[in-house]
Amino acid sequence: IEDRPGLLALKIDPDTHQPVPYVVPGGRFNEMYGWDSYFIGLGLIAHDQYELARGMLENMAYQIRHYGRMLNANRSYYLSRSQPPFYTPYLRAILDAYGDRVPLAWIREHLGIAIDEYENVWMNPQTHLTNTGLSRYYGEGKGRPKETEPGHFDFELKKYADRHGLDVREFERRYDSGEIVEPELDNWFVHDRSMRESGLDTTTRFDGVCASLACVDLNSILYRVETDLAALTDLYMAGEFTWRGASYPSGHWRAQAEKRRQLMKTFLWNEADGTWYDWNIDTQRQQPFVSASNLMPLWAGAATPEEARRAVASQLPQLLKSGGIASTGPIDKHNQPGPERQWDAPYGWAPHQIMIWEGLRRYGYDAQAQQAAFAWLRMLVRAAIEYNGLITEKFNVEKQSHKVDAEYGNVGARFEYVPAGGFGWTNTSFLLGLGYLSDAQKAELDALAG
C-alpha cells in the first residue's frame, strides 16, 4: 500500500509510476493549495530545491490539464473554483532559475497550459471576464461551500431563519435540501465562493460583493501573466508560438497587457486618491477601500512612475505597521456581522509582504521596501524565539503577535500543533526578506536570536 499513490496524489511520474511530490502549506492544510504553491515554490527556488520546485509546477499543470483550472486545493469540493492565477509567474520564476536544465519541449508544453488557463478560466465571458474588459473572481457552484466548519455562516443564515420562523439548523437543513428557495441567499453565497477563489477568505472588502468586482489584485496578476507570456515567447520561442492551431506571438501578449493597463487606468485608477480601487460592475462605480492589493500594480509592473509615486504616498502609510504590511486599512467593526475577518487589519500575511516588497523595489522605493521587510522579519524572529520556534500563517502586525482573534484561528499557533516545518509562504517570506535588509539589520536579527 505504501508504494501506491495516495488519495491526494496528482501527477504520476511516467518513468517511476510514483506521484510527483509537492509541498503543502503546513499545519492542518495537508493538500496542495493554489496560490500558496506559488509562494512556497519561490522559497524552494531560493533554497535551490530544483526537483521540488519543478514538481510544484508539474502538479499545477496536472490540475489545469485534467480539471480545467488550478484548484483552490486538490479536494473534490474545490473543483468549482480556482485561486489567484500564479501559474504563469511561477513558470517564469522556474525558467529564470533553471531554464538551462529543462528541454524546449517541456517549456512549450507549459506555455500552452498557461494559455489554456488564461483563456478558459480568466478570460471566459461566461464566468470571469466582465463587460469592462477586466476580469473578476467567480466561484461556481451553489449554496454553502462544503469545506466550511459547522456554524460558520450562522450570522448570515439567522436573518433568513427568522424570516421563516425557524431555528438556524432547521432553516439550514431545508435550504440545503432545496425545500426552501432563497435567491437572495443563493447570490450571497456566489459572492462568498468568489471571495474564497480570491484567496482572501474572508475580508470585509469582498463581503457580499466579490463577484461584482473587477479587482485590482486579479487584474494586476493577469497583467503580469500577459507580460510574462510575452517575455517567455521572445526568450524561448523566437517571438512566435502556436498552440492548438492558434498563433500567439509575443506581440499579442504585449498588446493584451497594454489593453489591460489602459482599462485599469480607466476603471480602477482614482485620480483624487492617487490609487487603484475595485470597480463594481453592478453599480458602475469604484469601491473605495484601502487594501494591500491596491499596491499590486507595482508588483505587476502595471503602474506608471507617477502612479507608483502617488500610490506609495497614499497607501503605504495606511498599511505599514510596526510588524509589517496589514491586509487592509482600519476597519470599522462596530456593525460588522460575524467574527473578525482574518484578511482585514490588523492582520498581515506573507504573500502581501512579498509582493509589496518586490513592487516597491521595482519602482525604486528601496528604503520603503527595506523598512517593510525588516518590520516583518523582526516580528517573525521575536515570535519564533518567544514561542518555541513558532511560525504561523498570519500575524497581528499592529501588536507584532501571532495571537489572532479572528475566524479560523491561526494555523500553527496551538503549541501541540506547532508545525515542525513552519508555514510554507511565511518561510518563503523570511528567506526572500533577508535580501532586502542591510548588514546592520541582519546583525540586529542575529542579536535577537541570541
Range-by-range predicted roles:
Residues 31-39, 78-89, 109, 113, ...:
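Aromatic- and histidine-enriched alpha-helix N-cap/loop-to-helix transition segments
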Residues 208-239, 243, 253, 341-372:
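Long, repeat-rich segments with strong aromatic
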Residues 64-110, 346:
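Aromatic/His-enriched, Gly/Pro-containing loop or helix-boundary segments
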Residues 33-63, 293-305, 353-366:
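Alpha-helical support elements that line or immediately flank enzyme active sites
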Residues 49-60, 101-122, 225, 238-264, ...:
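Extended, well-ordered alpha-helical scaffold segments
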Residues 42-46, 89-99, 224-235, 299, ...:
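Short glycine/serine- and small hydrophobic-enriched flexible loop segments
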Residues 89-141:
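Acidic/aromatic-lined carbohydrate-recognition and catalytic surfaces
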Residues 1-31, 55-61, 67-70, 74, ...:
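Extended glycan-interaction surfaces of carbohydrate-active proteins
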